Structure formats: structure tokens, C-alpha cells
Amino acid sequence: MLRATTSAVPRALSWPAAPGNGSEREPLDDRDPLLARVELALLSTVFVAVALSNGLVLGALVRRGRRGRWAPMHVFIGHLCLADLAVALFQVLPQLAWDATYRFRGPDALCRAVKYLQMVGMYASSYMILAMTLDRHRAICRPMLAYRHGGGARWNRPVLVAWAFSLLLSLPQLFIFAQRDVGDGSGVLDCWASFAEPWGLRAYVTWIALMVFVAPALGIAACQVLIFREIHTSLVPGPAERAGGHRGGRRAGSPREGARVSAAMAKTARMTLVIVAVYVLCWAPFFLVQLWSVWDPKAPREGPPFVLLMLLASLNSCTNPWIYASFSSSISSELRSLLCCPRRRTPPSLRPQEESCATASSFSARDTSS
């Protein structure tokens, strides 16, 4: 049986207690009171940070959408905010209530629903970043293909695929978790998971680490390498370009247009690099601790550093909105308006062209119209 303790967030990634042996089970409540208060304070801070950050950015996007059609970049950012808000509402908030009461207070159906939605938020947040990066790669490396698909709708294929995979990959939670007795005949119930085989826990936690963290990180990093290579190739003219102003059969645009496209591509590369670095830094501690806890029987599972690191599954959801807002002048200006910080309007001709670099459709539209 997979033991659900206050030291695992989400509790889908906890470690097992010895099944069928009440003497090996922990007491009904053996928490360190000080550590429990620190957990509650940390979870409360994370919840406020995730909800406020993503709520502000989503509000800025809604304000901008009322004045016209969303740019393709805004579609991805909007859905990433929704995914991160799902993390706050369905992962952090239930975990906060759970830690406050120590045991899960609710019927079996609610237990299964909470466990399912906790994983949906984790998957959706990771896969939306991957979908956005894949779209940026297509914009820069395959602009004609991107142009044929178009963009700007509130839903597009990468967004739908990201949500669909998140909903499907979270389904095992409904069958693994249930309200179960925490001891032999004690009558106390908690939302625990059980596996038919002793190796089931290790396999499941490793699978989640691969699908939520490792696979998306490798996909994002691979796109980053290809984007950097394309930018380097476009900025370093070959012999044919120097002789006739063409490369790869494409007609060269004006020097001003070429400089703007190059700057937009470079900005995309910088943003993607920041995303990869922050993504790894935020997720790595959590999953390293989770894997350590299930693969090493002697892991210090109850130590304060171990416990607190397991609370940081939602850290990436705090940083996502600010990364994209800092690289998007349009979102930044809307945020200033929301926060009552007026700024002198910049002429359209002088505004940064971040939307053209960040998504496939808008980048390719400019590229093909030159």
C-alpha cells in the first residue's frame, strides 16, 4: 500500500507502508508541530503566489482580447495560466486543507477526484510549456508549414493535444487511490494508494517523473538546440547569400526587416533558454527527492529538508507567468494598466515584435509577406 503522508505533495507520489502489519505503521498523528506549521505556511505562500501571478496575467490577456483577436502567442500563455491555476486550485489548495487536518476528510469519490485533478494540473502545466516550445520551433525552423496551419484561435491543435494527454495520463489516479483504513481495525481512513506488486510504487513514481519532468524537459531542450542552430544559420550568411542575397532559395527581405526578424528570433531563443533553466531548477529538487524516497529504503523521509522539498511541486507554476510577461511587451503593458501604473504609449512602429517570434503563425506570416 502506498502511504499518504503530509510530506508528499502531491500525495500521488508518496512511499509505501508495510501492508497488513499494524505494528509497522506510524501512529495516527506523529507530526512535528513546528514542521507542520512550516508546511502550512509554505503551502499558503505557494497558493497565493500561483493564484495571484497567473490570475493577473490571465486578466491582462482578457483585457487585451476584448480589444481584438488574441495573438497566437497569447493563446498558449492563456492556456498555460489556466493549467497553472488548476495546479493552485486542485493541487495546492486541497493539499493545504489536507495538511491542516492531517487525514483526508471526505468520501471516497472526493478522494479519487482530488488525486486525479492533482495530476491533471501537473501534466497540463508541463505539457503546455512543451506545446508552446514546439510551436516556436515550428515557427522558426518550418515557417511555411506553420503558415499553412494559421493561428490566433482560442484553441488550437497543440493546446488540445496538451490538455488531452493531461486528462488521459492522469486516469490511473482514479484506480490507485481510495479511502482506506490506515491501521488494522483502527477505523481511521485516509486517501491512500495500493499496488498489487511490491515494485508497483517504484514503477509508478518513476513513470510520473519521466512523463511530467524528464520527457518534457528533453523535448524543450531539443527544440532549444534546433532553434539556436536555425538562428545561427540565419545570422551567419553563407557564400550564396553573400554573392546573390539568397539562402536556401528564399528571397532576402530589406535590411530593416531582416534585422527585425533576427532580433525577434534571438528574443525567442533567450526566452526559451530561460524557460528550460527555470523548468529544470523548479522541478528537479521535487522529483529527485521523490525518486530517492522510493528507491532508497534508508532515505531520510521525515527530515525537515526532505519534507519541505516535497512541497515544491508547484514552484514552476509561480514562475511561468512572469517569464512570459517579461518577454512580452503587450502583456507587460496590460499588467501595468491592471496595477494602475500608466506608461507613456509607444508608437506601434517602435514596439517590440515579440508576437512574431513567439508563435508559428504570426512569425511565418511576416516571413512570407516580405
From Swiss-Prot:
Main location: membrane
Positions of the UniProt region annotated as Disordered: 1-28, 347-370
Localization, UniProt: Cell membrane
Keyword terms of this UniProt record: Cell membrane, G-protein coupled receptor, Glycoprotein, Lipoprotein, Membrane, Palmitate, Receptor, Transducer, Transmembrane, Transmembrane helix
Membrane topology: Multi-pass membrane protein
GO cellular component: a single term: plasma membrane
CDD domains, sorted: 7tmA_V2R
Glycosylated residues in this chain: 21
TM region positions: 38-62, 77-97, 113-134, 159-179, 200-219, 271-292, 308-327
Gene Ontology molecular function terms on file: vasopressin receptor activity
SUPFAM superfamilies: Family A G protein-coupled receptor-like
Subunit structure: Interacts with ARRDC4. Identified in a complex containing at least ARRDC4, V2R and HGS. Interacts with TMEM147.
Function summary: Receptor for arginine vasopressin. The activity of this receptor is mediated by G proteins which activate adenylate cyclase. Involved in renal water reabsorption.
Family named by the database record: Belongs to the G-protein coupled receptor 1 family. Vasopressin/oxytocin receptor subfamily.
Entry protein name: Vasopressin V2 receptor
